[in-house]
Regions:
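Adenosine-cofactor binding site in Rossmann-like domains, unifying the SAM/SAH pocket
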Residues: 25-42
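C-terminal substrate-binding subdomain of Rossmann-fold SDR/epimerase-dehydratase oxidoreductases
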Residues: 151-251
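NAD(P)-dependent short-chain dehydrogenase/reductase
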Residues: 102-106, 110, 114-166
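NAD(P)H-binding glycine-rich loop region in Rossmannoid oxidoreductase-like domains
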Residues: 41-72, 96-99
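NAD(P)-cofactor binding segment of oxidoreductase domains
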Residues: 50, 64-90, 114-115
Length: 251
């Protein structure tokens, strides 16, 4: 396939790019290349598929700058959807969309899903909490792996490994008859406090979801089965093992 991938230099996009290039021709658009989806000229190319991962993430930053999240997650997506209205589009959403009234980030993802529902060619991928060996800097999982957490919260989260996300996307690429919005996660929830001990406990804030757990039954019908789970991953990380991208094996 000839695929357009937005956000190809991001946390998920950079790994997805490597996986896609094994079997497809991929063109990337990313803000790090100076290509802002709000203003850039789109490639004058016929694509078989658009995978839209670009956008802003993070609850706390969205509270400080809600307009940026609206512009980057909603208006930029609107422009992309209109440009490629005759092309199949798979786009990244978030489990935060379940409770859009909690914060601007959640609201932007909810509106994104509502916007996409107006187009018959779209498929939403509602990612839950994604982690990997190389997490985003200064985010929760980065601090956890590097023993820099100062406290834990009372939240419950469905943690899904980056490579399970990549596998799910590859499955959905082939499932050309699927549309709507699908949950992508591990299908299991974990109490944050159970991941690390002997740290102060911070009560949950009203701007974040207390509990998340992906309903992956529809994904399982398509052949998706998560391979990695957070507690086993942390145990392997302490042993110095590394999960390889292309093989999914632990070395």
């Amino acid at each position: 396939m000839n695929i357009l991938l937005t956000g190809h230099k991001g946390f998920i996009g950079s790994s997805l790019l490597k996986a896609l290039e094994l079997n497809h021709t991929v063109t990337g658009i990313d803000l790090l290349d100076g290509k802002d989806l709000l203003t850039c000229e789109f490639p004058n190319t016929k694509f078989d598929l658009v995978i839209h991962l670009a956008g802003r993430s993070g609850v706390r930053e969205s509270i400080n700058d809600p307009s940026a999240y609206w512009m980057n997650n909603v208006e930029a997506s609107r422009r992309l959807f209109e440009r490629y209205e005759d092309t199949r589009i798979m786009y990244a959403s978030s489990s935060s969309a379940y409770e859009p009234d909690l914060n601007p980030y959640a609201a932007s993802k909810y509106v994104l899903e509502e916007l996409a529902s107006r187009y018959s060619n779209t498929l939403g991928m509602r990612f839950h909490t994604v982690y990997s060996n190389t997490p985003r800097k200064n985010m929760f999982f980065d601090r956890l792996l590097n023993n820099k957490l100062e406290y834990v919260t009372t939240h419950y989260r469905d943690f899904v490994h980056l490579f399970d996300i990549i596998n799910a996307i590859n499955i959905l690429i082939e499932a050309t008859y699927v549309n709507g919005v699908l949950d992508i996660g591990s299908g299991k929830t974990v109490k944050i406090q159970d991941l690390v001990s002997n740290l102060p406990i911070l009560m949950s804030t009203p701007t974040e979801r207390q509990y998340t757990c992906a309903n992956i039954e529809k994904m399982k019908v398509l052949g998706y089965e998560p391979k990695y789970f957070i507690k086993e991953f942390l145990t392997n990380s302490k042993k110095g093992t590394i999960i390889k991208l292309n093989t999914g094996e632990i070395a």
